[in-house]
């Protein structure tokens, strides 16, 4: 192939960027001719137009031409050149004005002509017409097919002569890839003439002229399109029609190596076509750009529909769509009426690099929507953004291909029926669609869960059993076989009559029963059967065979002389009925604390006792209900006969050495053991053991009682065949010969059968009590959700807590979790409304707090703490989340996520009485504190059976250092006393030593010092404490029966925001170190009471404990020795 200008390729690199092209369409009054003004964007293009001006004039008829501005539109082109994967032969060479998206159109020759005039506008003005339909088998760019009615002029010379219509070529528009061998001006005259068309009569008004002109264009387009599919050779269409062919534009993605705007598809049907080709000069580029400008000018009033179709056709821009589709859609709308012929259709074909093509069907009903037949994989990304807009429009077409579209359907559409969509709209629609899909999936979840086999609770199981009874398949089969044999076999008449009578009688009986039986009778039997099976299902709770832990022991207990420093630490192991007490070489802390380290001790001795027939009770005898589980009062164990047991223990010791507990090392206790055994053989041996926390004390007491009844229950069960174990204060248990304590709840069998098989008790109340205790695990099994779930349901449980749960599994929204506890928070909030607002309750709380404050031990020169101000805030604690309850050997556990933001505020006041300095501290201590043997404690016994507050739970009387002799206790603010050999703390001894010196006494006698001491003594010390926030996991525990306590404490130290503002008189102390120290100490005191293993307790009136006088087995009705025999 040749070109007119050989150095065109070199010029293109130096050419300036084309300016924004403009279009001016002029039409004569006679409407026979149309004048379109265009020019190149540079000087070279103007010279080129002057060169061909003479050919324009020759081709014009004598018809008059009237210049009229028809339309104008600015378009800013964005030329983009991609990488050419095909090689250098297809490298992109762009000329000025060449950044267009269409190829030259094949237009028929018409009798009328159109005159092209030079426009004075310097901007590039390009003519655009409806382009040619893409060849189905060609790639997206390549040489353009020419016909006798198509011509073009070229400005580029190239050595390449072979056509580039092969599908393997890169889809890039180059100057050499779209040229022909024609270099004369005659073909260009045919192109100019083909722009002419026959129009309707001139008398039609201006809007009508638009519609008639477009109608003719649409008709000629549809007719010629159908012919073009069957005829691949050049032809001369009728002069009365303007034959237009559609072709695909903007379908190439920008990553295919070509410009999405400048890469038209080749219309060649075969690379072996020998017809003449034409070159692509800059003039052709201007013409192509002008064609597109004209199409956009025409469809501007209907730009919304064009954007929708263009986006559907695979463009990356909302406005980018093929000129053929956009022009035709707007032309159809301009017609203003429905086309009666449904044969008119438009076809927009997609031709990818593999040459995939789509056919068209001209017989499409107007009501049918286009359907997609395929979708290339390279446009998957576009599909997601286009799918939502297509669904909203009711179109089910491919994101790349508008395969079939009825012309009449497009014409019937009004412009208000279409909405303006942009790229961001598609994203929003996609999100909205996903939400709709999620909402549509919600009703399906219950069905899916039901099909997957949800584990139903007892009521659901009963309903399912009633609604879905099992079919008696075998019975029905046998009955059908009998009927078949009866009808087939030649039976005698009397046999047939017998069978017939039996059958009729059976059916009559069934009908009578069905009519006269109440409808709920069958359902009742089903419910009874299911409930019976449900009741016998018990919890699988296994108690540890060995209960071990630290306790405090005292040899002799006297409430009037007792002090915590008189106790020593022991490690206790309870295995069956055997109790082992291991004494360490040094004491550990007398009270448990959160996250305490493992003590490093060595055991120096060990005592072994048999608790069989022992008497277990609490001392003092008359403990107030609120002090039953106070750790300051011990558990008393009056041991039974120990002679046989100790001889057996010695034999076991000789055969196998006794290992020390896990917390210690090997203990050298073998030599003194015979002496200890002799001592323990005495019947009057009594042990006093203190729990380190109140909750541990209750647990130890319950287990001691069970161990004391272990052997007696074995004897009873072995002596009486089928006999039942005696009453236990907790739950039923069966014993093993080894003496290990085994819980009956560990068996999967229920206790209902055992109750039915037991002989009747003499006392009805006792049997009722027995049955209640036996059914404890069964009763709790109905109250606590089952641990086991079906495999289909188990992932759902983990979805609430695990972030890695599968997305397809239904998840509980956070709002639902909050709603589950909303009713509890609302109920508590309403109940405590008056509690927060009424003065009666604030005074009651103030009194309770004051009773606690009065028991705090302060230095002897300080007055008592008083509560001067209390503000309980405006809110009560809220439950943020309630975890699933569970039951273990310690009872029922419920974990609650709590939060408090109520601004609880209280102000404490005290004074320092410096006049007491230098006086005998023992005398002052006798008035306030509890000191030990030397001092008499007349109130100690009185406090035991009263509801008056005892010493603070956070008091330091039990907080001494882990020394062998129980050394000096740690000093805490406001907690001074005599401990560890009845010695005061080091600081107090140092202060006493200074104040008793003669120099200090002389100094205090001076008037100035006396005056200052009086001023300081009269100055109040104020401390305002505000609890702003408290948040943590609160554990609520209810021990197994019999108990009347509910224990609560935080699993770990909660997040507490305390603000302490100390004042010295009217002056507020603002030292950061002082306030931080006070806040830290307050948090430590809070942990000593409310952080596990320390738990606070409240007693519930409706619950009964072993010490409850209302109980049939109350231990307080009789003296302690006899009370131990009662369960």
Swiss-Prot record:
Compositionally biased tracts (Basic and acidic residues): 366-382, 650-670
Keyword Endoplasmic reticulum in annotation: yes
Positions of post-translational Phosphothreonine modification: 262
One of the GO BP terms on file: lipid transport
GO MF, one annotated term: lipid binding
GO cellular component: endoplasmic reticulum; endoplasmic reticulum membrane; membrane; nuclear membrane
Segments crossing the lipid bilayer: 475-495, 497-517
Localization per record: Endoplasmic reticulum membrane; Nucleus membrane
Protein known as: Testis-expressed protein 2
């Amino acid at each position: 192939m040749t070109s007119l200008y050989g150095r065109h390729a070199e010029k293109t690199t130096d050419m300036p960027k084309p300016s924004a092209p403009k279009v001016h369409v002029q039409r004569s009054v006679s409407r026979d001719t149309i004048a379109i003004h265009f020019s190149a964007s540079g000087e070279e293009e103007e010279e080129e137009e002057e060169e061909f001006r003479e050919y324009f004039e020759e081709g014009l008829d004598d018809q008059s031409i009237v210049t009229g501005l028809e339309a104008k539109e600015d378009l800013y082109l964005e030329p983009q050149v991609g990488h050419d994967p095909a090689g250098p032969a297809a490298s992109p060479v762009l000329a000025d004005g060449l950044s267009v998206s269409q190829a030259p159109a094949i237009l028929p020759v018409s009798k009328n002509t159109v005159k092209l005039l030079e426009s004075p506008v310097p901007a590039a003005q390009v003519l655009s017409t409806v382009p040619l339909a893409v060849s189905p088998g060609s790639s997206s760019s390549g040489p353009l097919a020419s016909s006798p009615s198509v011509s073009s002029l070229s400005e580029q010379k190239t050595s390449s002569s072979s056509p580039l219509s092969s599908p393997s070529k890169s889809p890039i528009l180059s100057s050499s890839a779209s040229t022909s061998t024609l270099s004369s001006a005659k073909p260009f005259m045919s192109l100019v003439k083909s722009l002419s068309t026959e129009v309707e009569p001139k008398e039609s008004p201006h809007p009508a002229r638009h519609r008639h002109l477009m109608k003719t264009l649409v008709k000629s387009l549809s007719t010629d399109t159908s012919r073009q599919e069957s005829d691949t050779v050049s032809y001369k269409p009728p002069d009365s029609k303007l034959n237009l062919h559609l072709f695909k534009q903007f379908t190439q993605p920008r990553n295919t190596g070509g410009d999405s705007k400048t890469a038209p598809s080749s219309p060649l049907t075969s690379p072996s076509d020998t017809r003449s080709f034409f070159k692509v000069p800059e003039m052709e580029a201007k013409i192509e750009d002008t064609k597109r400008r004209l199409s956009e000018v025409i469809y501007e009033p209907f730009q919304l529909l064009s954007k929708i179709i263009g986006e559907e056709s695979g463009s990356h821009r909302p406005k980018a769509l093929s000129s053929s589709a956009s022009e035709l859609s707007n032309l159809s709308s301009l017609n203003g009426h429905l086309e009666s012929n449904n044969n008119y259709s438009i076809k927009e074909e997609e031709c990818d690099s593999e040459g995939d093509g789509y056919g068209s069907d001209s017989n499409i009903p107007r009501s049918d929507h286009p359907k997609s037949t395929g979708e290339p994989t390279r446009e998957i990304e576009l599909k997601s953004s286009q799918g939502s807009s297509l669904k909203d429009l009711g179109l089910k077409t491919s994101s790349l291909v508008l395969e079939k579209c009825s012309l009449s359907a497009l014409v019937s559409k009004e412009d208000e029926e279409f909405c303006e969509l942009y790229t961001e709209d598609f994203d929003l629609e996609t999100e909205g669609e996903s939400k709709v899909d999620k909402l549509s999936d919600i009703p399906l979840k219950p069905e899916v869960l039901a099909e997957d086999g949800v584990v139903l609770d007892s009521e659901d199981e009963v309903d399912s059993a009633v609604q879905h009874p099992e079919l008696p398949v075998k019975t029905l089969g046998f009955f059908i076989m009998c009927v078949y044999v009866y009808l087939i076999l030649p039976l005698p008449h009397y046999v047939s009559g017998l069978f017939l009578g039996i059958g009729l009688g059976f059916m009559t009986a069934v009908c009578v029963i069905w009519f006269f039986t109440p409808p709920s009778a069958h359902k009742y039997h089903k419910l009874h059967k299911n409930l019976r099976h449900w009741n016998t299902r018990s919890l699988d709770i296994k108690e540890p065979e060995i209960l071990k832990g630290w306790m405090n022991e005292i040899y002799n207990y006297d409430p009037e002389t007792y002090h915590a420093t008189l106790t020593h630490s022991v490690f206790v192991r309870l295995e069956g009925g055997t109790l082992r007490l291991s004494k360490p070489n040094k004491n550990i802390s007398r009270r448990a604390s959160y996250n305490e380290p493992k003590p490093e001790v060595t055991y120096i001795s060990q005592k072994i006792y048999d608790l069989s027939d022992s008497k277990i009770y609490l001392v003092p005898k008359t403990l107030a209900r609120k002090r039953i589980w106070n750790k300051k009062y011990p558990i008393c164990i009056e041991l039974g006969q120990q002679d046989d047991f100790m001889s057996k223990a010695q034999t076991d010791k000789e055969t196998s050495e006794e290992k020390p507990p896990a917390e210690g090392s090997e203990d050298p206790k073998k030599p003194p053991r015979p002496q200890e055994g002799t001592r323990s053989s005495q019947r009057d041996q009594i042990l006093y053991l203190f729990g380190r926390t109140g909750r541990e004390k209750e647990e130890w007491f319950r287990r001691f009682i069970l161990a004391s009844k272990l052997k007696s229950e074995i004897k009873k069960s072995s002596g009486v065949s089928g006999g039942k174990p005696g009453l236990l204060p907790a739950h039923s248990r069966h014993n093993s010969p080894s003496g290990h304590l085994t819980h009956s709840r560990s068996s999967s069998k229920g206790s209902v059968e055992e109750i039915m098989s037991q002989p009747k008790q003499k006392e009805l109340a006792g049997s009722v009590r027995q049955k209640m205790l036996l059914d404890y695990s069964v009763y709790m099994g109905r109250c606590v959700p089952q641990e086991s779930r079906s495999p289909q349901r188990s992932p759902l449980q983990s979805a609430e807590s695990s972030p890695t749960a599968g997305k397809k599994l239904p998840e509980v929204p956070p709002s639902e979790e909050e709603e589950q506890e909303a009713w509890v928070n609302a109920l508590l909030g309403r109940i405590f409304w008056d509690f927060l607002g009424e003065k009666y309750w604030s005074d009651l709380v103030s009194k309770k707090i004051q009773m606690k404050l009065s028991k705090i031990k302060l230095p002897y020169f300080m007055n008592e703490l008083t509560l001067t101000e209390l503000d309980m805030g405006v809110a009560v604690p809220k439950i943020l989340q309630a975890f699933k309850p569970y039951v273990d050997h310690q009872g029922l556990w419920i974990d609650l996520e709590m939060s408090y933001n109520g601004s609880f505020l209280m102000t404490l006041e005290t004074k320092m009485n410096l006049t007491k300095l230098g006086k005998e501290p023992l005398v002052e201590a006798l008035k306030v504190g509890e000191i030990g043997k030397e001092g008499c404690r007349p109130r100690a016994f009185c406090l035991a059976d009263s509801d008056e507050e005892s010493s603070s739970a956070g008091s330091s009387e039990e907080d001494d250092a882990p020394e062998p002799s129980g050394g000096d206790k740690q000093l805490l603010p406001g907690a001074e006393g005599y401990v560890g050999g009845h010695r005061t703390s080091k600081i107090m001894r140092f202060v006493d030593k200074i104040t008793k010196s003669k120099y200090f006494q002389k100094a205090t006698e001076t008037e100035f010092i006396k005056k200052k001491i009086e001023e300081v003594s009269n100055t109040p010390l104020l401390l305002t404490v505000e609890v702003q926030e408290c948040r943590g996991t609160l554990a609520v525990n209810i021990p197994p029966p019999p108990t009347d306590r509910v224990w609560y404490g935080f699993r770990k130290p909660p997040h507490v925001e305390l603000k302490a503002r100390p004042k010295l008189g009217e002056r507020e102390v603002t030292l950061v170190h002082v306030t931080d120290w006070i806040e830290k100490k307050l948090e430590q005191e809070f942990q000593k009471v409310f952080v596990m293993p320390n738990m606070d307790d409240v007693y519930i009136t409706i619950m009964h404990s072993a010490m409850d006088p209302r109980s049939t087995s109350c231990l307080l009705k009789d003296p302690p020795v006899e009370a131990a025999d009662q369960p």
